[in-house]
């Protein structure tokens, strides 16, 4: 009886481990897709010659304006 129970337990644990790997693979796929999208976006911005530095400065100013000073 104990051996059969051990086998059942082993089978259950292996079945539980399989989907985790699938999830990791899916995550990797989406990550690589996102990277490609980023590269495409970067190429577009280079073609349009968007001033990225100015945009960053604007972001910082907006962030500072929103955060309450003197905590």
Curated annotation (Swiss-Prot):
Keyword vocabulary terms for this entry: Nucleus
Disulfide bonds: none
Localisation: Nucleus
Pfam families for this protein: SNURF
Origin: domain of life: Eukaryota
Keyword Nucleus: yes
One cellular component (GO) term of this entry: nuclear speck
Additional remarks: Encoded on a bicistronic transcript that code for two proteins, SNRPN and SNURF.
Family: Belongs to the SNURF family.
Protein name (Swiss-Prot/TrEMBL): SNRPN upstream reading frame protein
Lineage start: Eukaryota, Metazoa, Chordata, Craniata, Vertebrata
